[in-house]
Amino acid sequence: MCCRYFIEDTTEMQTIIGDMLRSSLVQKWNALSPIKTCGEISPTDIVPVIASNLSRQRAVFPMKWGFTGKTLLMNARVETAAVKPTFREAWKSHRCIVPASYYFEWEHLINQNGRKKTGDKYAIQPQGNNTTWLCGLYRFENDLPFFVVLTREPGEQIRFIHDRMPLILPEHLVNEWINPDADPAELVKAAVTDVIAEKAI
């Protein structure tokens, strides 16, 4: 699961944000709600997201986190996204990358009564990286783009925290992931699992 992440004010993120500001969608979204470009990000926030433009070139667009419906959908399981009606079209051709500095996860524990409880909050990111490239899917609702973050089984280092983690790719595969002609099932095999987790203050 992934329900929070953080954007730090780094040179790389500033470049991504600068690219986003060229999008005509900025004005449309700002008329509804401010775009968040730093700090802790939550579902329903509007944030910078990398995707292909109409010319199939890499671009950055403001998108809102969560598919709307009976309940807000903020995540999609990578194991079933290709077949679930809600996600299968986006899986084929509307893939995106959500740039983050790191994501947050809370320990899921079992108390003495066998009930689940929430433990410590952790900040998690790939080993040796300042930017975390979260894989997502997007769709249009009322002519505006909305996205979900894909999740997968966790790596061994963080299995004690949660039974899911976001699908993360190395930077060199970002352009391939957003390419509508690429095979996402093949790219998933290159997912990053070597991550570090530190307790968040």
Describe each region flagged by the PLM.
Residues 1-201:
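Short linear sequence motif anchored by a di-proline
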